[in-house]
From Swiss-Prot:
It comes from Mesorhizobium japonicum (strain LMG 29417 / CECT 9101 / MAFF 303099) (Mesorhizobium loti (strain MAFF 303099)). GO terms for cellular component: cytoplasm. PROSITE patterns: HSP90. The gene is htpG. InterPro entries: HATPase_C_sf (IPR036890), Heat_shock_protein_90_CS (IPR019805), HSP90_C (IPR037196), Hsp90_fam (IPR001404), Hsp90_N (IPR020575), Ribosomal_Su5_D2-typ_SF (IPR020568). It is found in: Cytoplasm. This is Chaperone protein HtpG. HAMAP family: HSP90.
Length: 628
């Protein structure tokens, strides 16, 4: 491969790009219109980057200071051209931007489309929009001249595994910026129709803050089809719902409908405009480890960064922008982190988003339930992290419960339905809702009509340790000792115990405790069990069982707390074991360990010692056969 920077050079695409191009050429998408939106979006980004660079280097603008995007059609030659006068690209920029994909989401994108999922929003989401051009073109030429440079370059590819970069004559290149020429496939020539191009550009990209012109055919005059007025500075009363939707799709990289639109202008000590959206579905990067938000920061309509942490991480699903009138255009990364102006914006924006979610929950419960289904697991991170807004977040929180069926339950509704004598909000945490609902630990609560929240997200076990109460009612795990349960009467139709526990049971409980040794901290008669024989619970003031499991799995638990084995003193199996004489000591010892292992299995664990469990079970079966 030549090292002469003036020579034509052919390079192979990275492996991931080659796979991606193959998918685009043999497109899994029925809606190929997306290509124009993506090219216009890239052109608008290039213009915004130039605006930003020109703050410190105004000479880059020369005598052409106004940004613009031009779309040209050439029906006879089956070509469409999208050109901008933005920042432009150098040779290295072209190789980096058009020959490789640096985003970590690329492989995930390939896997998604490789599975045959027809989901147009993936293109925008994963940052591979340029390559959508190969859905309609069998060759793409890109001619670009970097702002301030005396060189121009041409990038060309047929999308079949390689691309070519060569010098371009200055007279054949834009004075500044980038020109993308699509050589259309035969089945895509209809895109050169002026009406179709104009409607596509207006519907998909009429909101971009850069004017767009259309040249219908070679020699025709350019005419304006979008004036470049930023949508967020226009009065809300003048904006149509479809304009909001189009802008949302562009800024969020989604292709669905927004669940909520938040558009306001703050005035007073500082001025800023906000246009933000709660997506209608989960963005692909919602659970990225860095938990970064995607809100963009503008200063007087000049894009600055999308890395300003304008919202707390538990609101990272919100997409949109903030445009400040007070920050300097040359704001630095350090200033972004330390600016009191931005701190005030963050606070105001966060409170507004949470406030609008609260209004949605109050006025449109069904729509809010969908938002919670998509983003509740992320919002609950705020219960752990944001002490200042914890009460506000608790009011937004929704849960499944033993009384909710397939619906969601708010804490205010839970408190309103609490039983007389009930002092706490009871919950049970675990990995699987069905297993929780079948847990013997819930039997005493069901028998008393006490609602229990069923928490199945990993974050649940953490936030309940940080949120002391709601409306004065503490959160309490049903896997911990529940001293007040016996103070709440059974329901009229609940199964009542026929008799008091036999006196021999106390002796049997003491025997079990002795047999199990330090495997448990105690063995107690249970008030909560009505049908099952045994269950494991945590000590009254010990950690929740699920929290302890999560900490242990993460290697952050030095020593696990010993559980309490609760035994139902009225269960027929327990009564039978308690009635055995001294001659059955060995059998009773086996039974004690089997009861403990039964409780472990019901709690979602394995027997303490699989081999010993098997041997004890075999002896039990043999005894039953012998007596049969």
């Amino acid at each position: 491969m030549t090292t002469d920077t003036k020579a034509t050079e052919t390079r192979a695409f990275e492996a991931d790009v080659s796979r991606l191009l193959h998918m685009m050429v043999h497109s899994v998408y029925s809606d190929k219109d997306v290509f124009l939106r993506e090219l216009i979006s890239n052109a608008a980004d290039a213009c915004e980057k130039l605006r930003f660079e020109a703050v410190s280097r105004p000479e880059l603008l020369g005598d052409d200071p106004k940004p613009r995007i031009s779309i040209s059609a050439d029906p006879d030659n089956k070509e469409i051209t999208v050109e901008d006068n933005g920042i432009g690209m150098s040779r290295d920029d072209m190789a980096e931007a058009l020959g490789t994909i640096a985003r970590s989401g690329t492989r995930a994108f390939i896997e998604r489309v490789g599975s045959g999922t027809e989901d147009t929003q993936l293109i925008g989401q994963f940052g591979v929009g340029f390559y959508s051009a190969f859905m309609v073109a069998d060759r793409v030429d890109v001619i670009s001249r970097l702002a301030g440079s005396e060189e121009a370059w041409r990038w060309s590819s047929d999308g079949k595994g390689s691309y070519e970069i060569a010098p371009a004559p200055l007279e054949a290149a834009p004075r500044r910026g980038t020109r993308v020429v699509l050589h259309l496939m035969d089945d895509a020539v209809s895109y050169t129709g002026s009406y179709r191009l104009e409607q596509l550009a207006k519907s998909q990209s009429g909101h971009v803050p850069v004017p767009i012109t259309l040249i219908e055919k070679p020699g025709a005059e350019a005419r304006d089809i979008a004036d470049g007025t930023a949508l967020w500075v226009r009065p809300k009363s003048e904006i149509k719902p479809e304009e909001y939707t189009d802008f949302y799709r562009s800024v969020a990289g989604q292709y669905d409908e927004p669940a909520a639109t938040i558009h306001f202008r703050a005035e007073g000590r500082q001025e800023y405009s906000v246009l933000a959206f709660v997506p209608g579905s989960r963005p692909f990067d919602l659970f990225d480890q860095d938990r970064k938000g995607r809100m963009k920061l503008y200063v007087r309509r000049v894009f600055i960064t999308d890395d300003a942490d304008l919202l707390p991480r538990y609101l990272r699903f919100v997409r949109g922008l903030v445009d400040s009138a007070d920050l300097p255009l040359n704001v630095s990364r350090e200033m972004i982190q330390e600016s009191p102006l931005l701190a005030s914006i963050r606070k105001g924006l966060t409170n507004r988003v949470l406030g609008d979610l609260a209004k949605l929950a109050e006025n449109e419960a069904e729509a809010y339930a969908k938002v919670w289904e998509n983003f509740g697991v992320v919002l609950k991170e705020g219960l752990y992290e944001d002490y200042e807004r914890r009460e506000q977040l608790l009011k937004l929180a929704r849960f499944h419960s033993t009384a909710s069926g397939e619906g969601w339950r708010g804490l205010a509704d839970y408190v309103a339905a609490m039983k007389e004598g009930q002092k706490a909000i009871f919950f049970m945490a675990g990995d699987d809702r069905a297993r929780l609902e079948a847990s013997p630990q819930l039997e005493g609560f069901k028998a008393r009509g006490i609602e229990v929240l069923l928490l199945t997200d990993p974050v649940d076990s953490f936030w309940v340790t940080m949120a002391p109460d709601f409306d004065g009612k503490p959160f309490k795990s049903v896997t911990q000792g529940v001293a007040e349960l016996s103070d709440i009467p059974l329901l009229d139709d609940a199964k009542k115990p026929d008799t008091a526990a036999a006196p021999e049971v106390d002796g049997f409980l003491a025997f079990v405790k002795s047999a199990l040794g330090d495997a448990v901290s105690d063995v107690k008669a249970s008030d909560r069990l009505t049908e099952s024989a045994v269950c494991l619970v945590a000590p009254e003031h010990g950690p929740d069982r699920q929290f302890e499991r999560l900490m242990n799995a993460a290697g952050r638990l030095d020593k696990a707390a010993k559980p309490i084995l609760e035994i139902n003193p009225r269960h027929e199996r327990v009564l039978a074991l308690a009635g055995l004489g001294d001659e059955d000591q060995a059998f009773k010892d086996d039974a004690a360990h089997l009861l403990y292992d039964e409780a472990r299995v019901l709690d979602g664990d394995k027997p303490a010692d699989a081999r010993a469990f098997s041997e004890r079970l075999a002896r039990l079966i043999a005894r039953g056969i012998a007596k049969g």
